[in-house]
Curated annotation (Swiss-Prot):
Distributive alpha-N-methyltransferase that methylates the N-terminus of target proteins containing the N-terminal motif [Ala/Gly/Pro/Ser]-Pro-Lys when the initiator Met is cleaved. Specifically catalyzes mono-, di- or tri-methylation of the exposed alpha-amino group of the Ala, Gly or Ser residue in the [Ala/Gly/Ser]-Pro-Lys motif and mono- or di-methylation of Pro in the Pro-Pro-Lys motif. Some of the substrates may be primed by NTMT2-mediated monomethylation. Catalyzes the trimethylation of the N-terminal Gly in CENPA (after removal of Met-1). This is N-terminal Xaa-Pro-Lys N-methyltransferase 1. Pfam families: Methyltransf_PK. It comes from Bos taurus. InterPro entries: MeTrfase_NTM1, SAM-dependent_MTases_sf.
């Protein structure tokens, strides 16, 4: 549990905010120096997501998506805008959202809102989104705040909507990264938080073809 590794919650959040302010507003910056894996990541995410957009009667709509921890819009640009009519972005770092407006180019006109906010304080508009995409950011929330955020996301879904978490998973327990002030949780810990938020796991997939030295990355589709 994060309560065992985070001594000071306020400092946990403020330190992360300070860390990201110093990160370059580039794809490489967003990916911690692993910019070269961006295409591998996006292509796998697209395949994972499309199975829900293609199904019959209960298929997920393609009108509105929300990109959480969006940074400069790497995922918005390459995954969400090509598949959805309108995208909203939320990120704690204002400079990233400013950069997004040029990085996204012409298609960026279909980004409706740029919310500058930490996810612990963010509430998606109820019944507004077909897909809420949460990638490489859950480690910046405490267990309690993550569960509460997921509950708010659940309320933010349109009929047949889904939440996707894509993130690093530890082998066991919870590991604190003191550099960027984040945690990495084991898959079973994330499952427990997901259940506590009243969500069910629809699908789960491990990301392939990533460098050996980084954590295993999993995608979880939830409703």
């Amino acid at each position: 549990m994060t309560s065992e590794v985070i001594e000071d919650e306020k400092q946990f959040y403020s330190k992360a905010k300070t860390y990201w302010k110093e990160v370059p507003a580039t794809v490489d910056g967003m990916l911690g120096g692993y910019g070269h894996i961006s295409s591998i990541d996006i292509n796998s995410s697209r395949k994972f997501l499309q199975r829900f957009l293609r199904e019959g009667q209960n298929k997920t709509g393609t009108s509105y998506a929300l990109d959480c921890g969006a940074g400069i819009g790497r995922i918005t640009k390459r995954l969400l805008l090509p598949l959805f009519g309108v995208v909203d972005m939320v990120d704690v770092t204002e400079d990233f959202l400013v950069k997004a407006k040029t990085y996204l180019g012409e298609e960026g006109k279909r980004v409706r809102n740029f919310f500058c906010c930490g996810l612990q304080d963010f509430s998606p508009e109820p019944q507004s989104y077909d897909v809420i995409w949460i990638q490489w950011v859950i480690g910046h929330l405490t267990d309690q705040h993550l569960a509460e955020f997921l509950r708010r996301c659940k309320r933010g879904l349109r009929p047949n909507g889904i939440i996707v978490i894509k993130d690093n998973m530890a082998q066991e327990g919870v590991i604190l990264d003191d550099v960027d002030s984040s945690v990495c949780r084991a898959l079973d810990v994330v499952h427990r938080i997901v259940r506590s938020a009243g969500l069910s796991l629809l699908a789960q997939e491990r990301q392939e073809n990533l460098p050996d030295e980084i954590y295993h990355v999993y995608s979880l589709a939830l409703r």
